[in-house]
Curated annotation (Swiss-Prot):
The last Arg residue of the ACP-binding site is essential for the weak association between ACP/AcpP and FabH. It comes from the Bacteria. Belongs to the thiolase-like superfamily. FabH family. Catalyzes the condensation reaction of fatty acid synthesis by the addition to an acyl acceptor of two carbons from malonyl-ACP. Catalyzes the first condensation reaction which initiates fatty acid synthesis and may therefore play a role in governing the total rate of fatty acid production. Possesses both acetoacetyl-ACP synthase and acetyl transacylase activities. Its substrate specificity determines the biosynthesis of branched-chain and/or straight-chain of fatty acids. This is Beta-ketoacyl-[acyl-carrier-protein] synthase III 1. One of its GO terms (biological process) is fatty acid biosynthetic process. Homodimer. Pathway: Lipid metabolism; fatty acid biosynthesis. One of its GO terms (molecular function) is 3-oxoacyl-[acyl-carrier-protein] synthase activity.
Length: 310
């Protein structure tokens, strides 16, 4: 059985915070932020919008895109590091909101790589015949765990949610290969205490090495080469990290998603948010070979070779 994406949706808050806005509250500049990260602005949720609200809105759009209802969903997986509370899970909030009365529901935590973990967990459940339709959501309100006095982290993050419905697709479409990995010895480099804490130098070194390597490994597993890749959707973390992955695949710039300028790093939601953007812009077409790749705290990483279409 081939398993792929049947529908996709996203939600981003209306409030835009630009680099110039940040100049007013901390010692930084638009030039400093753009040069080091590629970010110009990010969306920030106000106090009335929490992680579950964003997740529900993205889920509704994914269901609509898939042409199914909540009652058709068998399992809900939510990747988040900013749940509204320890329990109930964000997935359970979604279950009630979309009327998925037949669905099991749980959250998982793999930081910015969480969507990749959720996507492959869903694929495995579907491929074994356990479930038919699985809703996978990445949703994070990182603005609530960022120290707004720390220019090294505060400038990076935004809020948002992305969701996909996964199920059976035509032969040759969907997930062709994948890789998930973790290195717990690097957990000290990126973690949450009261706020997000990051050793930027070490995270950069890890990400530059791991993203490119993961892309090449999933291609090899699928019996494909760099020349077969039509589009790259990396986790939107840092322009220099993303460029390193693109260069490893010998792709031109127009073949890589770069939504970081508009949305910043939205953690587990960054890949589906970027995919929606590229679909709307017509840059992802039916039959395209897409590489999805992400990394996050843990340290964790994941990559998927995906043939787009149903």
């Amino acid at each position: 059985m081939n398993v792929g994406i049947l529908g996709i949706g996203r939600y981003v808050p209306e409030k835009v915070v630009t680099n110039h806005d940040l100049e007013k509250i901390m010692e930084t500049s638009d030039e400093w932020i753009r040069t080091r990260t590629g970010i110009a602005e990010r969306r920030i949720a106000d106090d009335t919008i929490d992680t579950s609200y964003m997740a529900v809105e993205a889920s509704k759009k994914a269901l609509e895109d898939a042409g199914i209802s909540g009652e058709d969903i068998d399992l809900i997986l939510v990747a988040t590091v900013t749940p509204d509370r320890a329990f109930p899970a964000v997935a359970c909030v979604i279950q009630e909101a979309i009327g998925a009365k037949h669905a099991a529901a749980m959250d998982l935590s793999a930081a910015c790589a969480g969507f990749m973990y959720g996507m492959i967990t869903a694929q495995q459940f579907i491929q074994t015949g356990t479930y038919k339709n699985v809703l996978v959501v990445g949703s994070d309100k990182l603005s609530k765990i960022v120290d707004w006095n720390d220019r090294n982290t505060a400038v990076l993050f935004g809020d948002g949610a992305g969701a996909v419905v996964m199920g059976a697709v035509s032969e040759g479409k969907g997930v062709l290969s994948f890789e998930l990995g973790a290195d717990g010895s690097g957990g000290k480099h990126l973690y949450q205490d009261e706020y997000v804490m990051m050793n930027g130098r070490e995270v950069f070194k890890f990400a530059v090495r791991q993203l490119g390597d993961s892309c090449l490994r999933v291609l090899d597993k699928a019996g494909l080469t760099k020349e077969d890749v039509d589009f790259l959707v990396p986790h939107q973390a840092n322009i220099r990290i993303m460029e390193s992955a693109r260069e490893r695949l010998n792709l031109p710039q127009e073949k890589m998603s770069m939504t970081i300028e508009k949305f910043g790093n939205t953690s587990a939601s960054s890949i589906p948010i970027a995919m929606v953007e590229e679909l709307q812009n017509g840059r992802i077409q039916d039959g395209d070979l897409i590489i999805l790749v992400g990394f996050g705290g843990g340290l964790t990483w994941g990559a998927v070779a995906l043939r787009w279409g149903k």
